[in-house]
Amino acid sequence: MSFTLAIVGRPNVGKSTLFNRLVGKRLALVDDQPGVTRDLREGDARLIDLRFTVIDTAGLEEVTDDSLQGRMRRLTERAVEMADVCLFLIDGRVGVTPSDEVFADILRRKNAHVILGVNKAEGRAGDGGAIEAWSLGLGEPIRLSAEHGEGMDDLYHILRPIAEGFAERAAADAPVVDVDVPEEEADLEADPEAHKPTVKHPLQIAVIGRPNAGKSTLINKIIGEDRLLTGPEAGITRDAISVRSEWHGTPIRIFDTAGMRKKARISDKLEKLSVADGLRAVRFAEVVVVLLDVEIPFEQQDLRIADFAETEGRAVVVAVNKWDLEGEKQEKLAELKEMFERLLPQLRGAPLVTVSAKTGRGLDRLHAAILRAHDIWNRRITTARLNTWLGAMVEAHPPPAPGGRRIKLRYMTQVKTRPPGFVVMCSHPDEMPDSYRRYLVNGLRDHFDMPGTPIRLTMRGQGDKNPFKERKFRTPSRLRKHLGKKD
């Protein structure tokens, strides 16, 4: 699991030069004029055997928020909140300036991992700056020369244990998804207790929403605390913070995104970063709650995240907040359902719940909808039931006959859960039109009561390996029994 490193500091301390060295390309403009970098630049960095994302930021400057430099500074502060690690650079030839002291204090408050680097420290010219750097209270500084590549080994040895810690937490945070259904269990009903949330394995929920949707208020109401950040448990990244709690007897772990807590209207780049934070939180979740503001529902950002959750195979629940402020409730509800079906057809039937995070009304319904979505996400259907259903579907609406050759659907089985995944053995799978696939997926939703959850349907030909490919058989097949052979 990679991590994110933000390079921050005053203008013209060598941030872009170091960025270019780490990514191995000249992606950032380098100039002696302060403030050349006016935006955030991301790149894939390599440092010996470490792989991580590096962000080159605009220079931190003490300026008014109304100026271009003010917007650059806010963008940099945003990057600091996003990053897992911050490398704070000062100029070893200039030494510590009052601005360095101010921003060292900001970094201590905003990021858990801050590395102090003294750049341009090659030779005796950087000795004074390296000694002065101790006064910033950020621990032992490392001497660097981004221009000549000096100090990269020291940076590696500091980043290595941090990277290992993030990798361990990533493994602990990641939910179990795309679970194989063993062949010998394909004809067995699933045990409903097998996926029931426990204290050891709580139900993992990501609440995603725009800053004014009331996300923090909703989470605070669910966990019963006044502040979201009261005793938070750090997740894999600074922007993914998880809180463990119990909700109506259900052990839960709610992932919140720091990046979407604050207004991100500074620039288009900030808006993109906020969306990126939300997308990262989706990967930690089993169920994603997309929180909408009843006054401005289904904006582009909401649709992108809901679509991404479906693509990632997560269960989705849509919650419409501030319902207590709505006057024409019945008309509004009908309008919301129509918009949902039209804008997100791939999530047809997903629960849409109205809530008031402020008063707590509707949270019982939200809890029930989340549990039901989680249950459907874990649903298993026996092969016998699937093939009975498939026969009825084919009889009601036979597959097309491209080029005069009728596509024959011979056999169907479920091969995965979390989300449900099915394989249909058929002739000419490459010629199966998308419209017929949608017909089967919608039929699965309706007949087996699986609204809203992502459904994966794969067509395989007679020459393909069987649906349980690359798995060892525990019992002899009927054909091998007939031939008198053993597996």
Swiss-Prot record:
GO molecular function: GTP binding
Binding-site residues for GTP 1, renumbered to this chain: 9-16, 56-60, 119-122
Annotated EngA-type G domain residues: 3-167, 203-378
Positions of transmembrane segments: none
Pfam hit, one: MMR_HSR1
Binding locations of GTP 2: 209-216, 256-260, 321-324
Residue span(s) of domain KH-like: 379-463
Record keywords, A-Z: GTP-binding, Nucleotide-binding, Repeat, Ribosome biogenesis
Entry keyword GTP-binding: yes
Region (Disordered): 451-487
Compositional bias ranges of the Basic residues kind: 471-487
A biological-process GO annotation: ribosome biogenesis
Signal peptide: none
Quaternary structure, from the entry: Associates with the 50S ribosomal subunit.
Function: GTPase that plays an essential role in the late steps of ribosome biogenesis.
Protein family: Belongs to the TRAFAC class TrmE-Era-EngA-EngB-Septin-like GTPase superfamily. EngA (Der) GTPase family.
Protein name as annotated: GTPase Der
Gene: der
